[in-house]
Amino acid sequence: MTKVLLGFMGVGKTTVSKHLSMHCKDMDAIIEAKIGMSIAAFFEQHGEIAFRTIESQVLKDLLFANDNSVIVTGGGVVVLQENRQLLRKNHQHNILLVASFETLYQRLKHDKKSQRPLFLKYSKEAFYEFYQQRMVFYEGLSDLVIRVDHRTPEEVANIIEGY
C-alpha cells in the first residue's frame, strides 16, 4: 500500500523523503515537471484554482498506481474535498508530520530559496488562522502523527520506515 506524507508547508516532507530508503514520489516536483515552471510562477500566472486542479489529478494518478511508494504531498493537498476523499481511501497509510506554528513560521520566513505564494500574502496573525484551518484537515486524515520539532530528518525517516 502506498504511504502518503502530509503536513503543512515547511514541515520537512521533502527533506525527510530524501532520507527514506523507500521510493518517493514528490508531488511538487512531478507537478513542476508537468507544468514546465515553478509552482510559485504557476500560481502567479494561473491562480490557485488551476493549480489545485492539476494537483488533484496528480494525487489521483499516484494513489491509483498503488506501487508501495511514498507520496510526498504539497502542503495544500487537503484543500479540495475530492483530495480528502481520495486520502480517506488510503486509510492506515497517511502520515502527518507536525511542527509548532512558530517553528514553521520561522522556517518559511527564512527560506529564501523557496518563496511560497500563500506564505507571502498573509500577515503572521492571518497565517496562523490559515495554519489552524489546514491542521483540522490534516489531523482528520492522518493515521500516524510524527512531531518533528526536535527530531532530525533521519529520525523521522526511521519512524516512517518502521510504520
UniProtKB/Swiss-Prot annotation:
Coiled coil: none annotated. Substrate binds at residues 28, 52, 75, 134. It catalyses: shikimate + ATP = 3-phosphoshikimate + ADP + H(+). Pfam families: SKI. Mg(2+) binds at residue 14. Its main location: cytoplasm. ATP binds at residues 10-15, 116, 151. It is found in: Cytoplasm. Its cofactor is Mg(2+). One of its GO terms (biological process) is aromatic amino acid family biosynthetic process. One of its GO terms (molecular function) is magnesium ion binding. Keywords: Amino-acid biosynthesis, Aromatic amino acid biosynthesis, ATP-binding, Cytoplasm, Kinase, Magnesium, Metal-binding, Nucleotide-binding, Transferase. InterPro entries: P-loop_NTPase, Shikimate/glucono_kinase, Shikimate_kinase/TSH1. Its EC number is 2.7.1.71. Catalyzes the specific phosphorylation of the 3-hydroxyl group of shikimic acid using ATP as a cosubstrate. Belongs to the shikimate kinase family. Monomer. This is Shikimate kinase. It comes from Streptococcus pyogenes serotype M12 (strain MGAS2096). The lineage of its organism: Bacteria, Bacillati, Bacillota, Bacilli, Lactobacillales. The gene is aroK.
